[in-house]
């Protein structure tokens, strides 16, 4: 609703976004002297310039600002994709006058954060350090293994990061 639908979005946006995501990962690898890396969800902040440079906003979007609109689009995409791979957190929330039927698979993760724990993962952190930090969150690895039991350590870690971003997008934890 903040993007001018009449202006259209060219295929160049997708290409530029892909290149910027890969570039963010390569930059991080070079800074940390790593031979290999992967694109993490946190690298997707690198695509924001691709979005702001390729979309036209309506008046309300201009008022909010191109950066914020791009960030919100990214957040909405994570929210939409999250429920394709993991249970929808919105369906687990208690409705007025109704009992919660399904066990909340995110309970131990939320409880870990509610207990005063936090996770500070900076954009330029080494892959091995990021993986180590992700494993500190109670229940996070178990949740990923429950739904994707055949991943490698790096694939699991990427999914663990995805879960955290997804839960934040669904307001179960704070960023």
Segments predicted by a language model, with ranges:
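An accessory alpha-helical subdomain
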Residues: 4-13
């Amino acid at each position: 609703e903040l993007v001018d639908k009449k202006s259209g979005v060219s295929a160049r946006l997708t290409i530029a976004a892909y290149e910027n995501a890969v570039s963010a990962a390569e930059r991080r690898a070079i800074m940390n002297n790593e031979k290999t890396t992967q694109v993490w969800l946190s690298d997707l902040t690198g695509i924001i310039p691709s979005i702001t440079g390729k979309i036209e906003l309506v008046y309300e979007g201009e008022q909010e600002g191109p950066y914020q609109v791009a960030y919100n689009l990214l957040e909405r995409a994570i929210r939409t994709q999250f429920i394709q791979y993991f249970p929808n957190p919105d369906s687990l929330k208690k409705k007025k006058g109704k009992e919660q039927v399904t066990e909340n698979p995110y309970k131990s993760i939320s409880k870990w954060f509610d207990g005063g724990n936090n996770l500070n993962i900076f954009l330029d952190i080494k892959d091995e350090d990021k993986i180590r930090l992700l494993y500190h969150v109670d229940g996070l690895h178990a949740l990923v293994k429950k739904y994707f039991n055949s991943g490698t350590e790096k694939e699991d870690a990427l999914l663990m990061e995805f879960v955290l971003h997804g839960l934040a997008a669904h307001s179960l934890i704070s960023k």
